[in-house]
Amino acid sequence: MATIPGGGTIMDPMHLYRARRDKERRGVLKTYKILGFISSGTYGRVYKAVLLPPPKTASAKSALPSSTRAALSLPKDKLPSPSFTEDSDPLNNPEMCMRPGDRPAKRGDVFAIKKFKPDKEGDVLTYAGISQSGAREIMLNRELHHRNLVSLREVILEDKSIYMVFEYAEHDFLQIIHYHSQTARASIPPSTLRRLLHQLLCGVHFLHSNFVLHRDLKPANILVTSQGVVKIGDLGLARLWHKPLAQQGLYGGDKVVVTIWYRAPELILGAKHYTAAVDIWAVGCIYAELLSLRPIFKGDEAKMDGKKSLPFQRDQMGKICEVLGPVKPEQWPGIVHMPEYRTYQATGPYPHSNPLAPWYHARSNSSEGYDILVKMFEWDPARRITARDALRHPWFQEEGGVDTKSVFEGSSITYPTRRVTHEDNGDAKMGSLPQSMAGGRLPSSSNFRPASGNIVQPAARKKARI
């Protein structure tokens, strides 16, 4: 409060706002009912939750001091009229550009809650604040709003823990790939595949148009709602790239980006300055995986040594050369300036064949589909197709085009819903489920993800990045 001549005071409007906000704030378990555990990874744990009804108590305004209530009160005829309807909720209508947090969610809405893990030194948990990855993810999700990006509902800070509440998606590309490879044992219908890739490119084009690199595109991070809308998730490695914050550019912040099977050759060769082309290479890898139901460049990742120096990923480079043939300076003039170019030459020889064409045509007879894949797998990042140009490619006009709201339109396939387990042994804060229903963890980025069932007892799993 500010003092004025005569001894009076002026009520600070922000003080009133903060007092009201603090009175109305509810904890995560008082706001959402945890339905089950979805997955766990390096940075967090993800739960499926449903919104609880608001408590039947006196209004927050009546809980404030009388002077504050008077300052906040308005005559009934002056109250603002509602500007939202149920149909305008972007969680119900993905075409809307309004932010999900612009209106209160309704009871029964389902969400995915990501809880960040605290740092760990030995066996002791430490709370040193939010990680760079977490801060970046929150910032970008709050700023970016698009039909093909996962929507952030709210961020909750409680008991030194941070929770991100996202819209819920029943499927992801990895689940769809697993269903076709293990259950249906049949390829993804060409029309469905084109729509999946088209919506993915729409989201990627939006990110690149706003100078954002995703840097971790892979099937497990590409979600699909039950309405058939593709949603790009996990912006933990994403960052702005038009004005690098460090003198070392993008390399200075994160030296290792993109999961190894989807990593572009310029990253493998140690590029310190790179562009949105790294995301397009990953999209090409995803396209090939949707087509063949298995990763096209499945190399073994070399781990860092005790000196924390980054090793050259020879095996991954070899897998790429097995499909595309060895790269030559005529194909990529800038390769001779790559930090790892001499290492690449010294660790050969690499296969000299180029079986991409027969590999593709054994799975599809579309010449346009092959053309766009070749342009995504261009060695030279400066020549690699952009998301904008890819969306204009004639392949997307085949068989009636992709001008549909749902990627599942015209398909008779019913994909299983996302697996959710009862698990609470790793997180006492979220442990609202009965102990008798406790189980293991669910794989979120493994080809061994089972394809059906809602509540299951899973087998042991490998850690995934969440």
Swiss-Prot record:
InterPro entries: CDK, Kinase-like_dom_sf, Prot_kinase_dom, Ser/Thr_kinase_AS. Residues 58-105, 421-466 are annotated as: Disordered. SMART domains: S_TKc. ATP binds at residues 38-46, 114. GO terms for biological process: negative regulation of filamentous growth; negative regulation of transcription by RNA polymerase II; nuclear-transcribed mRNA catabolic process, non-stop decay; positive regulation of transcription by RNA polymerase II; protein destabilization. It is an enzyme of class 2 (transferase). Its cofactor is Mg(2+). SUPFAM superfamilies: Protein kinase-like (PK-like). It is found in: Nucleus. Keywords: Activator, ATP-binding, Kinase, Magnesium, Metal-binding, Nucleotide-binding, Nucleus, Repressor, Serine/threonine-protein kinase, Transcription, Transcription regulation, Transferase. It comes from the Eukaryota. It catalyses: L-seryl-[protein] + ATP = O-phospho-L-seryl-[protein] + ADP + H(+); L-threonyl-[protein] + ATP = O-phospho-L-threonyl-[protein] + ADP + H(+); [DNA-directed RNA polymerase] + ATP = phospho-[DNA-directed RNA polymerase] + ADP + H(+). GO terms for cellular component: CKM complex; mediator complex; nucleus. The active site is at residue 216. One of its GO terms (molecular function) is metal ion binding. CDD domains: STKc_CDK8_like (cd07842). Residues 32-396 form the Protein kinase domain. PANTHER family: CELL DIVISION PROTEIN KINASE (PTHR24056), CYCLIN-DEPENDENT KINASE 8-RELATED (PTHR24056:SF495). Component of the SRB8-11 complex. The SRB8-11 complex is a regulatory module of the Mediator complex which is itself involved in regulation of basal and activated RNA polymerase II-dependent transcription. The SRB8-11 complex may be involved in the transcriptional repression of a subset of genes regulated by Mediator. It may inhibit the association of the Mediator complex with RNA polymerase II to form the holoenzyme complex. The SRB8-11 complex phosphorylates the C-terminal domain (CTD) of the largest subunit of RNA polymerase II. Belongs to the protein kinase superfamily. CMGC Ser/Thr protein kinase family. CDC2/CDKX subfamily. This is Serine/threonine-protein kinase SSN3. It comes from Cryptococcus neoformans var. neoformans serotype D (strain JEC21 / ATCC MYA-565).
